[in-house]
Design a protein with these regions (language model features):
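Acidic/His metal-coordination segments adjacent to aromatic residues that form catalytic metal sites
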Residues: 68-72, 97-98
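N-terminal intrinsically disordered, cationic/polar leader segments
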Residues: 1-38, 45-46, 51-57, 64, ...
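Membrane-helix boundary connector in multi-pass membrane proteins
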Residues: 94-104
Length: 143
């Protein structure tokens, strides 16, 4: 699996990403996108439009990485996740353009991401050791 392309300034986080197993990378990406969306909401309330937009752009990049990490041969779950990520990207894009309902849209996306993160964490904790490539493919991750 390719490493996330999100810029990382923090040395600890950079090391964590470089040494993470594929399942851990997914969790790191979920944590990052949730953080970016929460920061966007705070900055929206503070009327810092530029910071709001930057955090939404970062969140979109992470969600696109999550899409790219899917093994589309693992049907139907990979296709369903792809569609869900696509929906999230549209909602974030709408929030960037339509100020009226952006708070509700972003909160809905955050809840979905939190649910997905919880699910992936459960999978990580119950999945067999990640040495076998076939095991990873079954978990919808591409190498």
């Amino acid at each position: 699996m390719e490493r996330p392309k999100v810029p990382v300034d923090d040395r600890y986080l950079r090391m964590k990403i470089q040494t993470a197993k594929p399942m851990e990378l997914i969790l790191i990406m979920y944590d990052g996108v949730i953080l970016f969306l929460k920061r966007a909401l705070v900055n929206y309330e503070l009327r810092k439009r530029h910071v709001f937009d930057e955090n939404l752009k970062k969140s979109k990049r992470v969600i696109k990485e999550l899409q790219l990490s899917l093994n589309m041969d693992a049907k139907p779950i990979a296709g369903q996740l792809y569609s869900l990520y696509d929906y999230m990207l549209r909602e974030i894009g709408d929030a960037m353009c339509n100020r009226k309902e952006n708070r509700a849209k972003l909160q809905r996306v955050i809840r979905m991401l939190q649910d997905l993160r919880t699910t992936w964490d459960k999978i990580k904790n119950t999945a067999p050791v990640e040495k076998d490539k076939r095991t990873l493919e079954k978990l919808t991750l591409s190498m």
